[in-house]
Swiss-Prot record:
Disulfide bonds: none annotated. Pathway: Pyrimidine metabolism; dTTP biosynthesis. The gene is thyA. This is Thymidylate synthase. Transmembrane segments: none annotated.
């Protein structure tokens, strides 16, 4: 994954320093693209260890349409904890652990009506179910899009969706995906996002009877936080290792039937993890 290291170097060398919502400060570029051929290996970063289990559990959580972090915490995944404290959720009139209309809600219940107590009815549009059917029945469509960004609700959550929109493309019986990420925390978030959407592409390809093509990552505000510069420089001293392979249970034919046990990576080798603080 040399392209990722090239992005780190590009931001350090050419990015502009600016303030940000968290008060940490960033060095940013606007508009960047990376392409990964999924047939040549699974794009899980090797120049630092990435916790694949957290990526899988989070994606299954999204696909469930869940917005409460209890499922994550029950599975010992803590990546959303900073935004699910009582202090954070109280800002939006929600109980501790309830994030509101974040990814899972938008994917599975977009535009749902809201009750007086702040809960949502299950009367929204299921974008994932629609997408799967459309790929199966109309693979040449240029409308194979899922949006996590609902402008009417973006201000009602502690962290509005960063990876906002993704589109699929079928050619030669292979499924490709492009993600647009409005805000890209390149050191901590982007390695997770690349692997998560590559995994989703494999899963959807399997249930639609397709092979895999490319995953294209496109970033808007593409940045390194100021307190990640030294970690990025350390990572740039490391040579990428061969990519691992993804193995899915071939018996799973429905996207909503996947369980953690159905998903594994084979041959993952990496350099040691590099710790860095999360900006909230």
């Amino acid at each position: 994954m040399r392209a990722y290291l090239d992005l780190l170097q590009h931001i350090l060398d050419n990015g502009g320093d600016k303030g940000d919502r968290t008060g940490t400060g960033t060095r940013s570029v606007f508009g960047h693209q990376m392409r990964f051929d999924l047939s040549k290996g699974f794009p899980l970063l090797t120049t630092k260890k990435v916790h694949f289990r957290s990526i899988v559990i989070e994606l299954l959580w999204f696909l469930k349409g869940d917005t409460n972090v209890k499922y994550l915490q029950d599975n010992k995944v803590t990546i959303w904890d900073e935004w699910a404290t009582a202090e954070q959720t109280a800002r939006f009139g929600r109980p501790e652990h309830e994030l509101g209309p974040v990814y899972g809600h938008q994917w599975r219940n977009f535009g749902a009506t809201k009750n007086a107590d702040g809960t949502y009815n299950q009367d929204g549009f299921d974008q994932i179910k629609w997408l799967i059917n459309e790929i199966k029945t109309n693979p040449n469509s240029r409308r194979l899009i899922v949006s996590g960004w609902n402008p009417n609700e973006a201000g009602q959550v502690a962290l509005p969706p960063c990876h906002t929109l993704f589109q699929f493309f079928v050619q030669d019986n292979k499924l490709s995906c492009q993600l647009y990420q409005r805000s890209a925390d390149v050191f901590l978030g982007v390695p997770f996002n690349i692997a998560s959407y590559a995994l989703l592409t494999h899963m959807i390809a399997q249930v639609c009877g397709l092979g895999v093509g490319d995953f294209v990552w496109t970033g808007g505000d593409t940045h390194l936080y100021a307190n990640h510069f030294e970690q990025a420089k350390l990572q740039l001293t490391r040579e990428p290792l061969p990519l691992c392979q993804l193995k899915l249970n071939p018996e799973v034919k429905d996207i909503f039937d996947f369980k953690f046990e159905d998903i594994e990576i084979v041959g993952y080798e990496s350099h040691p993890a590099i710790k860095a603080p999360v900006a909230v």
